[in-house]
Regions:
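Phosphate-binding/catalytic loop of phosphoryl-transfer enzymes
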Residues: 1-82
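ATP-binding/phosphotransfer module of carbohydrate and carboxylate kinases, centering on a glycine-rich
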Residues: 6-9, 27-31, 36, 73-175
Length: 175
């Protein structure tokens, strides 16, 4: 990176490398003209960023994908990290795919998560009660998680985005 900065003639310019979640939260803070923002993106995974009450991003990663929100002994285990009860299992396209069979939606087991999300979103547009149950479950869990996150983050504003929040399902999550 330093070589690129030098080669491009940018070596004298200030720069900072930060997580994309932090950039999103900072953009949200600037857009809202407010500080104390927790940004959450429900997409391929669960991404997060935080702007404190003074308008600063912190030097740590706000990686809530693997932060626990479900402390039950039988909480779902993330296949990648091995973490149990973590946010990615509740607020991502993985969550939709995990919940679909429980809601009675049978999709091919080898169907990639993004495609499963699209199928559930299509069902949601037709007022399918099974799809609605998935989004209500995500919304209920999200409400509890936000209260839990507030124990660690001093936020007054919440920025929610990502593929899972697209369309009617996203409205249901926030209802």
């Amino acid at each position: 990176f330093h070589r690129v900065m030098e080669a491009e003639g940018w070596a004298d310019r200030p720069w900072e490398i930060v997580n994309d979640g932090e950039v999103t939260a900072l953009a949200g803070s600037m857009s809202l003209k407010a500080n104390a923002v927790l940004g959450i993106s429900m997409g391929t995974s669960l991404a997060a960023g935080y702007v404190d009450p003074h308008g600063n991003i912190k030097p740590w990663l706000n990686e809530l994908a693997f932060a626990p929100i479900d402390y039950r002994t039988d909480a779902p285990t993330d296949e990648w990290s091995g973490d149990q009860g973590c946010g990615v299992q509740y607020f991502s396209q993985q969550a939709v795919a995990r919940l679909a069979p429980h809601a009675g939606i049978q999709l091919p087991p080898d169907m990639p998560f993004p495609e499963q999300l699209v199928e559930v979103q299509k069902l949601m547009e037709t007022d399918d009660e099974r799809a609605a149950a998935i989004y209500r479950t995500i919304g209920t869990c999200f409400g509890y998680a936000i209260a839990h996150y507030h124990s660690y983050y001093d936020f007054e504003n919440l920025l929610i985005l990502g593929r899972v929040t697209t369309g009617v399902g996203g409205e249901s999550i926030l209802a």
